[in-house]
Amino acid sequence: MAGKGIADVLFCLDSSTSMEPCFDAVRQHLVSFVEGLKSDGQFEWDLRFDFVSHSTSSFKSGSEIIFRAKSIYEENLFDALYKNKSQENNAKLFTSSISDFVDKLNKLRAGGDETNLIALDTCLDFPLRPGSDCHRVIILLTDEPLETGLEIQEQLEKIPDLITKIHSLGVLLFMIGPDSAGYEELSAANRSTYDVVPKGNGLATVDFKRVLNQIGKSVSASRAQVIRGSVNKALFGQNTWVSSSRTEMRGA
């Protein structure tokens, strides 16, 4: 008799100017991820999907940084995660509907620069299901090295803390991006993979049908892990940033 797998799947999407081809590819081939999950024929899957679409801009000669992050239902994601304590707010995060996910992804527009590890930390703060039977999966997609974005040094300094957090949450991290010493260091996290791809073309050369199918197979073959101990939220202090409409601003 088939068992039932459980997975929370988050796409961490660099939404900088060049990334439109990536959005198109994920929309077209998300079903390949699900097919990969089911390829062994042993499980039905209880799946929840969401994304963190993020971009960053610098103003006033770098003295002000504006972070923009949205999810499938939340236009102002930082407020949703860190400032609204109501439990019912969690209902606005995640969907079990692939068509709903694809529809929301279709409305994303690229623009700005990137701070991928701040976005990754935000993904890690989602209300992931804590049980030992839940696979917690983050798929990070970017066409720029960590070293060419904004807030570079701050992100590099937080890599050890991010690895600790990934381990505590039992997260499977899949990174698809160009060659980067920072991403390479982050890939030392247990159960993480890092596929190096060409820089700067919106991941247009990536075979997303194959890649997402393979990620699905890897998740299916993995062992879910329980969340261990307490986990520090908002490693970059994003829970304290001043919000303004759909942006989060803080002085450099």
PLM features per residue range, with description:
Residues 1-252:
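Divalent cation-coordinating acidic motifs and surrounding scaffolds
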